[in-house]
Amino acid sequence: MHQHDSSINVNVAVLTVSDTREMEDDQSGDSIVASLEEANHQAVHRSLVSDESDEIATLVSGWAASPEIDAIIVTGGTGPSPRDVTPQAVLPLFADALPGFGELFRQLSYQEIGAAAMLSRADAGWIDVGLLRTPVFLLPGSPKAVELAMGRLIIPQLSHLLTVCRGKKTI
């Protein structure tokens, strides 16, 4: 297993998907930004959209094509309700999946919330646009789930993931 390089500062776009939240009360988005800043990464773009597949896909694909964005984190819309369309919007954009992320997230969630963890469709993968390879994480909208994903999975591996998927010369 390779040692991760935590010295790389990562520029991240943060998207909250919600029909009920406004930017002013977006606790999950705030938590993502705070976690990034604590790890010396930057939230360079932040948006909030409703649970509309086309809006989500358009924003995520646009961000993935931007050379100033290294990674994308989406929170919300990953549950089992008919309005939860984040996976349907984003997964078709993936060139490759990172299945271990969702598996580990549900395992860690199970330790905290029990069988309800199986309702999560948290996921991750890469979007390739030209020479850009952008990791994308899909998180639940719950602030506790975001804290778990950021603290235990994303922040500890984000710099290393960028090094591996883009190569040291392009970072």
Please annotate each region the language model reported:
Residues 15-18, 74-76, 120, 138-140:
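Short beta-strand segments
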Residues 86-171:
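Proline/glycine-rich low-complexity loops and linkers
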Residues 1-51, 55:
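Glycine-rich phosphate/diphosphate-binding loop of Rossmann-like nucleotide-binding domains
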Residues 1-2, 57-61, 119-122:
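A generic local structural motif
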Residues 33, 37-75, 79-94:
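N-terminal small/polar loop signature for handling phosphorylated ligands or for N-terminal nucleophile
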Residues 26-27, 58, 85, 148-149:
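Generic recognition of short, well-ordered alpha-helical segments
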Residues 18-22, 78-81, 143-145:
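Gly/Ser/Thr-rich loops at beta-strand to alpha-helix junctions
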Residues 9-10, 67-69, 130-134:
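Short coil/turn connectors at secondary-structure junctions
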